[in-house]
């Protein structure tokens, strides 16, 4: 959405260790450079694509749009499955529950909705935010949802009751991203106020604040797969990987993509080497080597700003979605 309405050689080895399965010795070595190609282009949304997310079980891809709908597609074949309708305004973000049965959505109508994916029915509407809801995330246990809003607050919700259990006055400008860590004990939030903040899920207590260089607006935040680091995007064409516990140190900086205007999603690729994948305002997808920070591949095909990207949980598949002139979701596969 548009703004306005030390070396890690040791640490990165355990950044991904939880994701990697035991491999037989004859397994091919991990490639030094990725080789993704366009496999499917999915049409159907009537406005900009705001968020794409794979289900944790790997079967489905969900896409959300400014057209007020969520669409469900087959993750492997791109086949359209169903549309989830009910929001009164555009949707900015979506998240899956761990069992892949529920989706929550954040909308400009100031609500969060919970959906049963199989039936396509809306289960609950969560009300409390006073402005656009911009980001949502399920905790790993999927009994809580965290949301961030343009009202500068972060809220934690009980999935079963739909009640807000915690309201945190988190920032002094709109909240642009929220995410739970891998055990659900922490929440990270980012904001246009130039800070990334870490919160205790249970108490709502502020544990740490990371301030960006020159107070640059934070456009995206996400915990690393093991929860030890935070990836943050800022509106100066930069992604940074931070340690947040005590030294609050910027460990890696990734530049080359274009990001000065929109809140663009980035993510970790854990299935084929150690990459960071991000959208970009030059209509490309950028893949960075996490360790060396080099751009190892760019993916061309979209005809507008690539606002959102996601990586499949087990296969070498990337999904992407773009803005108004494009309106497509694309699925890319590693060859």
Swiss-Prot record:
Cited SUPFAM superfamilies: WD40 repeat-like
MF term (GO), any: histone binding
Compositional bias segments (type: Low complexity): 9-30
Keywords: Nucleus, Repeat, WD repeat
One Gene Ontology CC term in the entry: histone methyltransferase complex
UniProt entry tagged with the keyword Ribosomal protein: no
Primary location class: nucleus
Pfam families: Beta-prop_WDR5
Region (Disordered): 1-30
GO biological process, one term: transcription initiation-coupled chromatin remodeling
Places the protein is found: Nucleus
WD repeat residue numbers: 44-83, 86-127, 129-167, 170-209, 213-252, 256-298, 301-335
Protein family (similarity comment): Belongs to the WD repeat WDR5/wds family.
Subunit organization: May interact with the histone-lysine N-methyltransferase complex.
Protein name: WD repeat-containing protein 5 homolog
Classification of source organism: Eukaryota, Amoebozoa, Evosea, Eumycetozoa, Dictyostelia
Name of encoding gene: wdr5
């Amino acid at each position: 959405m548009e703004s306005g309405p030390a070396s890690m050689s040791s640490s990165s080895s355990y950044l991904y260790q939880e994701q990697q399965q035991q491999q037989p010795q004859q397994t091919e070595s991990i490639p030094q450079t990725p080789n993704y190609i366009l496999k499917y282009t999915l049409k159907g949304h009537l406005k900009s694509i705001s968020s794409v997310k794979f289900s944790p079980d790997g079967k489905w891809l969900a896409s959300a749009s400014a057209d007020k709908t969520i669409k469900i597609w087959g993750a492997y074949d791109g086949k359209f499955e169903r549309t989830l309708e009910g929001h009164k305004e555009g949707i900015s973000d979506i998240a899956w529950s761990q069992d892949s049965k529920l989706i929550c959505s954040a909308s400009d109508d100031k609500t969060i909705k919970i959906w049963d994916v199989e039936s396509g029915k809306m289960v609950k509407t969560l009300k409390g935010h006073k402005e656009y809801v911009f980001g949502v995330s399920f905790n790993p246990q999927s009994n809580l949802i965290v949301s961030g809003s343009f009202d500068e607050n972060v809220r934690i919700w009980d999935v079963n009751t739909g009640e807000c259990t915690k309201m945190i006055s988190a920032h002094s400008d709109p909240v642009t991203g929220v995410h739970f860590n891998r055990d659900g004990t922490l929440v990270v939030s980012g904001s246009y106020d130039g800070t990334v903040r870490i919160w205790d899920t249970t108490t709502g207590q502020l544990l740490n604040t990371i301030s960006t260089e020159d107070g640059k607006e934070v456009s995206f935040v996400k915990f690393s797969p093991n929860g030890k680091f935070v990836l943050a995007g800022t509106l100066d064409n930069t992604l940074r990987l931070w340690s947040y516990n005590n030294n609050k140190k910027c460990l890696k900086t990734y530049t080359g993509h274009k990001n000065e205007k929109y809140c663009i999603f980035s993510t970790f690729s854990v299935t084929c080497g150690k990459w960071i994948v991000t959208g970009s305002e030059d209509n490309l997808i950028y893949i960075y080597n996490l360790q060396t920070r080099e751009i190892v591949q760019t993916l061309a095909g979209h005809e507008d700003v690539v606002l959102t990207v996601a990586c499949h949980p087990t296969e070498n598949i990337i999904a992407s979605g773009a803005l108004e002139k494009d309106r497509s979701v694309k699925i890319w596969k590693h060859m």
